[in-house]
A protein has these predicted regions:
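Periplasmic N-terminal accessory/gating domains of Gram-negative outer-membrane beta-barrel systems
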Residues: 1-95, 114-115, 127, 131, ...
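Membrane-embedded beta-strands of outer-membrane beta-barrel proteins
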Residues: 25, 87-89, 132, 203, ...
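Outer-membrane beta-barrel channels and translocator barrels
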Residues: 32, 67, 94-96, 139-141, ...
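Flexible, solvent-exposed coil segments and beta strand-coil junctions
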Residues: 50, 65-69, 110-116, 177-186, ...
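Transmembrane beta-strands of outer-membrane beta-barrel pores
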Residues: 76-78, 106-112, 151-155, 221-225, ...
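Outer-membrane beta-barrel domain signature
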Residues: 76-80, 119-121, 190-193, 242-244
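Transmembrane beta-barrel wall of Gram-negative outer-membrane proteins
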Residues: 101, 123-225, 246-267
């Protein structure tokens, strides 16, 4: 149970497909992008709609070791919950208590721990995760802290089709020509891709002003580096230079107040500032164009940069939510 989907699949109203960055969560038969995912009531959805998981991160949007509970609503009667056609999924983070508690953890998996898919064996890979959580009092009964850090790394070969004997000589010709004429390193269709990685940081402070009022501060940052393919390497000869880096850096600061103004009136206020960055870049660099070359066999080769995916996206989104 190391992902959001691993918890939700226990509920028959959810259909979970895929793992890692490819996990898709469908609620009540709806599209997997129709969910609204929040962390402590603050939206953590994919702002661009490019991730199959619907999250604002490539892998888990938050470490499950930092969560106290996951709450799911399908048709809530509340003005504070909306923007979804599937399910509203809220992850609630842990808080510090009067007792110091901590945990150091690590786990790994590879292809030997995964079953075959339709009789076909899984390609070789390895996935490692390490992290820690720690919480306790700063001022007993008044001020508490909770921190968590997690890093993950995944190694996997490229998803390339085998190179046919009649095509290898032409592919070598293309590689040599680009190197000798333009001093351009195209790489090779079959290669060990750079590792995919993720780092997550959570810092939470809870201050109990008195029995009726409390304030809260949460800092969360998630950094993803993911290597993605284009032009279907399982059907074409896609050189390593044609893959591209898909990095995400999401930083969030949340300030919250919860209090009872009177016996009949309660107030909850939240202010959140979110900065989202996605600076995509081709492994082949930015100074060489996109080329498709037809081989004598009728197959296609893509030996240069993937220019269509180069972009810099920066989204700053302050939000206020009084209730």
């Amino acid at each position: 149970d190391k992902g959001i989907g691993d918890f939700l699949k226990r509920d028959s109203r959810f259909a979970i497909q895929g793992t890692f960055r490819d996990v898709q969560i469908a609620a009540l038969g709806s599209n997997n992008r129709y969910n609204n995912f929040t962390i402590d009531g603050v939206a953590a959805n994919d702002p661009l709609g490019l991730n199959a998981n619907g999250f604002a991160s490539v892998r888990n949007p938050i470490s499950v070791e930092t969560l106290a509970q996951i709450r799911v609503d399908f048709a809530p009667y509340s003005v504070t919950k909306g923007n979804f056609g599937g399910a509203n999924i809220n992850a609630v983070t842990k808080s510090g208590t009067n007792e110091f508690k901590g945990k150091v953890y690590g786990y790994e998996t590879d292809q030997t721990n995964v079953g075959d898919v339709l009789g076909e064996p899984i390609n070789q890979f390895s996935d490692e995760t390490t992290g820690f959580v720690f919480g306790g009092p700063i001022i007993e009964d008044k001020l508490f802290f909770f921190v968590g850090y997690e890093e993950s790394e995944r190694f996997a070969p490229s998803n390339s089709q085998p190179i046919a004997a009649e095509d290898e000589a032409e592919l070598r010709q293309i590689q040599d020509f680009l190197q000798s004429r333009f001093n351009y390193d195209s790489g090779w269709p079959i290669f060990n891709a750079p590792p995919e990685s993720q780092e997550q940081t959570l810092i939470k402070l809870d201050y109990s002003i008195n029995d009726n009022h409390r304030v809260e501060y949460i800092y969360q940052e998630t950094q993803d580096i993911n290597i993605r393919e284009y032009d279907r390497p399982n059907l074409n000869y896609v050189f390593s230079s044609h893959y591209y880096v898909y990095p995400i850096d999401r930083e969030k600061n949340t300030f919250a107040y919860v209090g009872d103004i009177s016996d009949d009136l309660s107030l909850e206020m939240k202010y959140t500032d979110i900065v989202y960055k996605n600076d995509q870049d081709s492994l082949g660099g930015e100074n060489f164009g996109h080329h498709r070359i037809a081989l004598s066999s009728g197959e296609y080769a893509y030996p240069t940069s993937e220019q269509y995916r180069l972009s810099l996206i920066h989204i700053s989104e302050p939000t206020r939510r009084p209730i």
